Amino acid sequence: MPLKEDDCCLFAEEYDGPPLSYNIPCAVPINVEKIPVAAVVSPVCISDNMSFPVIQPILSVESKKFLIDSVSPTSVIANCGSNQLELVSDSITVSPTSVIEHTEEEEEEEGGDGEDCELSSSGELLLRSCSVKESLDLNESSSNPLVPDWESNESVLSMDYPSSRVTGDCVSETNGDGKKQPVVTFLGIASDDGFEEEESCSNLRRVRVVPVKKQPQTKGKKGSCYRCFKGSRFTEKEVCLVCDAKYCNSCVLRAMGSMPEGRKCVTCIGFPIDESKRGSLGKCSRMLKRLLNDLEVKQIMKTERFCEANQLPAEYVYVNGQPLYPEELVTLQTCSNPPKKLKPGDYWYDKVSGLWGKEGEKPYQIISPHLNVGGPISPEASNGNTQVFINGREITKVELRMLQLAGVQCAGNPHFWVNEDGSYQEEGQKNTKGYIWGKAGTKLLCAVLSLPVPSKSTANASGEQLYSANSRSILDHLEHRTLQKILLVGNSGSGTSTIFKQAKILYKDVPFLEDERENIKVIIQTNVYGYLGMLLEGRERFEEEALALRNTKQCVLENIPADEGDAKSNDKTVTMYSIGPRLKAFSDWLLKTMAAGNLGVIFPAASREYAPLVEELWRDAAIQATYKRRSELGLLPSVASYFLERAIDVLTPDYEPSDLDILYAEGVTSSSGLACLDFSFPQTASEENLDPSDHHDSLLRYQLIRVPSRGLGENCKWIDMFEDVGMVVFVVSMSDYDQVSEDGTNKMLLTKKLFESIITHPIFENMDFLLILNKYDLLEEKVERVPLARCEWFQDFNPVVSRHRGSNNGNPTLGQLAFHFMAVKFKRFYSSLTGKKLFVSSSKSLDPNSVDSSLKLAMEILKWSEERTNICMSEYSMYSTEPSSFSN
């Protein structure tokens, strides 16, 4: 209708024409109460040069299809077509100093992560938006801004709004797709120094971390081994704790190596374990018990339980809606009463009473109170609906039932304040009304209702933090996680066993326990009977040689045939190596027992019975004559003379081996298995006077691992287990240069071959090597009699020796020259194969000072290697990462 000047109203007429090809604009009524407004800034705070930042609206994807003009916030015209424009949520605040938060419900529904953006107009603004599937690209939206009509808001802006934040009531309203509108957060104008910006960024919520299972690198048919692809589902296998790979009996040691973090593949070392297998940590399988000895199994299981990589990741545990930091998890696990069977998940924790439970469930344990972990407890933490609160948490019906039966007055929906000792009072009052768990009947009631009661450790903690045995073990393991491992290897007879025992005596307060000494006593006494048997075998040989020599001389002197001479000399069969009938019978019986392999079964149990015969045998002149020629008995070891000279005392029932006896004893350490020793070097007098901060080196822990030579042979079955050792100590017996093995090969050449196989193995490529040339005292004695050129590798040893040799006049001895020659030989051989430097030390394994010096040299090498790595890292961080910044 045409508008007349005197009309005060407008009327619309009904359209009855042809159908329209476009959408008809609709008039949307305005709810004035829901129009977002902002308070007028005080004129005092406004300067002439100050301009306000402009909020750029974020539109949906559908709205990008239309070209939209600037629309006033109070406009009533909206497009009501199929692609309807959706206004930003009514809860948006347009004040430059306000904060518009994106609620947790919207984030969880959209499933997006927060993204920080920065807008700058005249002042700096921090914009945090939620990246949802249907959000508009920020760059595109900023290029087509929708500038709001600020003039149309003048009618509603007033000084009647004292607050700078006005929020509508439609936060939970959804859009046409049933999804909530994304809300933008403005964190205000940053200060000049940027402090507010940094503080706001640091307060952003942490992203929830979801455990992701690592997949195995290879996988065969179902039920087969993941390495050799053999076997079936019925074949016994060992399972990796990380990727679930399964290995058979033949492949488990090669696939898992030395297991520095337990039963993990070598490629899985450093990864967290599968949480479904946490219950099997430290529980050894039958397969490992068959493959390894008890000491190795115990060490692997201990490492598996307490190593840092296998501990529960802190970010997987949520307490009162917040993920834990590593320090908080350690605090939680090391308290006097920690949560039992802690697994990844959401938990609630009442810090006042110590009540602990899973999110949305009733409490199942009372842990130590007042722990600074997680956030504040939520009223809906246990999903209660009783209108009764304990320390700000609405309790469940089961808890309410327990309180009512315990005599607590719960009428009127009270709010209780409960302490760790069970005392309770209403909020706002000081009078204690009673103790919830004070009666024995209440504890029985809690047991029936499956509710927790305070433990004795919680009641007696008195604010002091105590440590459980398991938590203490975790801390101890984390404290010593920098354990330096030293691998001790050498050929058979090189002296690795003696060095290992010497280290045990030097660095352990109690090197051998009582039962160990009793077992060593049996070994020593059995060895002495074996040495006597070797002497008796040599006596028979010497006796036969003496008789043959006598007959030959007699036949030559009398000029008669040898056969007739033997017949005439039957009565003259007594030589200096002959023994009486009684000792002869004992000798024959002992040799038969040795040949049958029953020496360890009969002796030393029968020592008391045969002690008189042994004493008589040792004092016999024939045995003494044989003992003087002991160097001609190839099977008799050099340490035999130490025990044979004390045979009468050693074979007594009340014999107790000394530390020196144990050092000389053979067979004390296993020749077929690993032997480990954890130790630390004691502080010297000079170190005790140093500053306490300089004691770090002496307090470091080391692990000496002795490996048998047969395990490092051609197949090298043990080498793959030692990829985490710090260095390798290779021991060489210098007195073996003239010895030969059973197949006739020189022992020094066999040692060289073993040394080559180890230094060229890829496992030891980046490790330092210390060569200990052992038995220096035996070398000095032997080299005077047997030339070093007896070994074909040392045929070029031609020293210039002075007539007046000796250490007194400053000239090196022949033994010193031989040692230096061997050291140079091994150094050149090592350098030719690896291109690196070999550290060399001489040693007398029976001398404690000599062994101590060699092992301390190993410590210094490890220390220097660590410092060298730190220096390289510091240089790397100081200079640019460009290739031109480095020089070769």
UniProtKB/Swiss-Prot annotation:
Domain notes: The helical domain (514-664) is required for self-activation.
Misc. comment: Dark-grown xlg1-1 xlg2-1 xlg3-1 triple mutant plants showed markedly increased primary root length compared with wild-type plants. Dark-grown roots of the xlg triple mutants also showed altered sensitivity to sugars, abscisic acid (ABA) hyposensitivity and ethylene hypersensitivity, whereas seed germination in xlg triple mutants was hypersensitive to osmotic stress and ABA.
One of the record's GO cellular component terms: nucleus
One Pfam family, short name: G-alpha
Keyword Cytoplasm attached: no
Primary location group: nucleus
Domain of life: Eukaryota
Motif, Nuclear localization signal: chain positions: 205-222
GO MF annotation, one: GTPase activity
Biological role stated in the UniProt entry: Guanine nucleotide-binding proteins (G proteins) are involved as modulators or transducers in various transmembrane signaling systems. Binds GTP with specificity. Plays a role in the root morphogenesis by regulation of the cell proliferation.
Binding site for Ca(2+): 497, 669
Full protein name: Extra-large guanine nucleotide-binding protein 1
Region (G5 motif): 843-848
Gene designation: XLG1
Family of the protein in this entry: Belongs to the G-alpha family. XLG subfamily.
Native source organism of the sequence: Arabidopsis thaliana (Mouse-ear cress)
Gene3D superfamilies: GI Alpha 1, domain 2-like, P-loop containing nucleotide triphosphate hydrolases
Region described as G3 motif: spans on this chain: 702-711
G1 motif: annotated segments: 485-498
Disruption phenotype: No visible phenotype.
Bias kind Acidic residues: ranges: 103-118
Subcellular location: Nucleus
Keywords, ordered alphabetically: Calcium, GTP-binding, Metal-binding, Nucleotide-binding, Nucleus, Transducer, Zinc, Zinc-finger
Keyword presence, Nucleotide-binding: yes
